Amino acid sequence: MNITFLGTSSGVPTLTRNVSSLALKLSQTAEVWLFDCGEGTQHQLMKSNIKSSQIKKIFITHMHGDHIYGLPGLLATLGLSGNSNGIEIYGPSELKSFVTSALESSFCKLSFPLRFRAVEDFASLNKILFENDKLKVHCACLKHRLPAYGYRVSEKDKPGVFDIKKAEDSNIPPGPIYSELQAGKTVQLKDGRSFNGQDFCGPPRKGESFVYCTDTVFSKSAVNLSKNADLLVHESTFSKEDEKMAYEKLHSTTIMAAKTALLSNVKKLIITHLSPRYTQRSSIKPSDLLKEAQKIFPNTYLAKDFLTAEIK
């Protein structure tokens, strides 16, 4: 799996950063899952290597405009191209009325169904938000000025590496039967011999995990959600020098994001959602924000629009 940042600015877009949105490209299928959809997201998609037609799920963290204003427009555009299977949208309960009102008021009729799922109960009760045979999604309550939710996408463990040579040495003819053995199934050949696939596979390979936390001040629930994840994307709206403002607005500093990564034992941290006050011409530059976080958590990277990063 990999992610592509479509917007990395906090509050308002800048000349170099759009407002919040991130695309997760699944390795198991051709699907793309979108996290937040600020104004201008569909334009960012056009500039990226992400195909909007592959978007099947959209996860919204909270109802602030810089995270949702691009959603009705994106859905309207997708409606022109057609998407017969529909799109699932996860987020706060108010999200459904916002989207349907915008579409109805503009006389927009989609050519595909929208399926909304409110996340409040799943977050408060620590229930699985979504699960299939390869992935599961959890969410958790964050700490912001209005209800906000972080998301974790966890890939289930994959079968171990299949030992082709061992299968060949056992005179098992190559073909579809190898796939069954790799899946751990017991198969019987035409000559009557039976083989257990687990005997031909190495130990299971641990699945990848990705966590997206914004907007929030430092939160223990974000730490718990991020435990042992391969990649944490966490907001870092403010420098440590502006900590007072972070507490007033319930946003994170670079130190808070790095502390979350450290306490949750993640492998890699990418900081995003930067305040537009930090530019190449300001006294505190984006590169300074990165250095602040790296002092606490060395394996930290700075997000920028269109950056693509592997989960593991």
Swiss-Prot record:
- Keyword Lipid metabolism listed: no
Per the entry, the cofactor note is: Binds 2 Zn(2+) ions.
Q: Where is the active site?
A: 66
What is the catalytic activity of this protein? Endonucleolytic cleavage of RNA, removing extra 3' nucleotides from tRNA precursor, generating 3' termini of tRNAs. A 3'-hydroxy group is left at the tRNA terminus and a 5'-phosphoryl group is left at the trailer molecule
What domain of life is recorded for the organism? Bacteria
Top-level EC class as recorded in UniProt: hydrolase
Catalytic activity, EC: 3.1.26.11
Q: Which UniProt keywords apply?
A: Endonuclease, Hydrolase, Metal-binding, Nuclease, tRNA processing, Zinc
Residues binding Zn(2+) 1, per UniProt: 62, 64, 144, 215
Cofactor(s) essential for the protein? Zn(2+)
So where does Zn(2+) 2 get bound? 66-67, 215, 273
Molecular function as annotated in GO: 3'-tRNA processing endoribonuclease activity; zinc ion binding
Summary of the function given for this chain in its UniProt record: Zinc phosphodiesterase, which displays some tRNA 3'-processing endonuclease activity. Probably involved in tRNA maturation, by removing a 3'-trailer from precursor tRNA.
Report the sequence similarity comment from the record.
Belongs to the RNase Z family.
Q: Which HAMAP family match?
A: RNase_Z_BN (MF_01818)
What does the subunit section of this Swiss-Prot or TrEMBL entry state?
A: Homodimer.
Return the protein name.
Answer: Ribonuclease Z
Tell me which species this is from. Answer: Prochlorococcus marinus subsp. pastoris (strain CCMP1986 / NIES-2087 / MED4)
